[in-house]
Structures are given as structure tokens and as C-alpha cells.
Amino acid sequence: RLSYFLWSSMPDEALMKLARAGKLSNPAELRRQTERMLKNPKAAAFGRHFPERWLKLHELGRMEPDKRGPYGHYFRVKEYLVPQVDAFFSDLLETNGPIRNFIDSDYTFMNKMLGELIYKQKVVGEHLRKVKLEDTRRGGLLTMPAVMTVTANGVDTSPIVRGVYVLENILGTPPPQPPPDVEPLSPDLRGVKTLKEQLAIHRNQEACRSCHQKIDPMGYALES
């Protein structure tokens, strides 16, 4: 299982020998083998497959924006979105960087197209490279365009969807399913102008309050 998890292929002879001897049940030996395997070129598969499954990047393209709409630039950067996440994850793994960089880093990986259309920074060439961010609010995984796109519907964004995404995929504390008798939003929205105001009304409903007090702040943080 360790080999297929890290290499997406069969174990080598060294790992087989240790497994037959029952030595992989020893935490120290397991750690040694994990570190050894991550240095092997085969571990590049882990650098691709793990973040893509973890962050649900297979859902990219499920609801693409209108090419003529305000998010039409998506189609010019689409091919770089998943590779950007993979490059960031693999670099953090290879350098044994601090885990907080997943959430807050002062750098990212970009090329000319991503720099021009997403980050508003000048970068030369098509190759993704490690670049210090001029706006550090764009650091980490959560603000990468791949994640922003996965948590949108092609027309607009949703703080609820993004809040649930953070709770499920980053914090590992998914909220329970909403009660079956709760409407998506309160029918009485007179005088309400913004989505934030609509959701505030929703949170005032007793059946919604406990979950949305956790969901909504997470989602709002990704809306600015």
C-alpha cells in the first residue's frame, strides 16, 4: 500500500524485503522508507495524484464560465491551473517546507500567462517557476485559480460552497447535511441587497445557525 500510495507502482526489492520481515510495522523504519521513497523520481506521481484528489481538481471543467463573460480569461490559463498546484505541492514536499505554506505563503508558481491575467505580475516564459508574490494575500493553495474555479459555478461564486470546501478538504470537519425541511434561503428578502445580507437572515434561522456560523466566515474569506 505504501508503494502504490507514494509511487503509484509496485514496491522495489528493498521494500518487499522489509515487508516480508515484518519491519514496516516499526514506526521508525516506516518513516525511513517513506523518506527514501519520496526522494525517488517515482514519487513525482504522488506530487500529482495526491493534491488533485485532495483538492477535488478533477471537477475542473464541470461548470466552465462563458467565454464571452467576465471570466473568459479562464480558457487562456486553463492548461496551467492543475500543473500550478502540482508544482507548489511538490516543491513544498521536496524542500520539507512548513505546512502553513499550504495556507499562507509569500510565493507561488506562475508563468507569463498566469502572471499577466491572474496575479498582475510580470513573469517571462511559459514554464511555471517559483515567484515571490507582490500581493501575499494570493499565497497558499486556497487562492490558486484552480481552487477558486472548482468552488465556483461558472457564473458567480458562493461563500457557502467555498466555506464547505474549506471545512471538508482543509480542516477535515465537514458540516452535516442540512435538515430536509430547510429552504435554500429565507423567502422574506425584502430590503436585502447583498448575498452577505441574505445569508445573515439564513443564519438567524435556528435550524441553520450552528452550521452556517462555521461555514460562512470561511467562505467570505475567499471572496475578497
For each feature predicted by the language model, list its residue ranges.
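Sequence context surrounding c-type heme c attachment/ligation sites in exported
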Residues: 115, 130-224
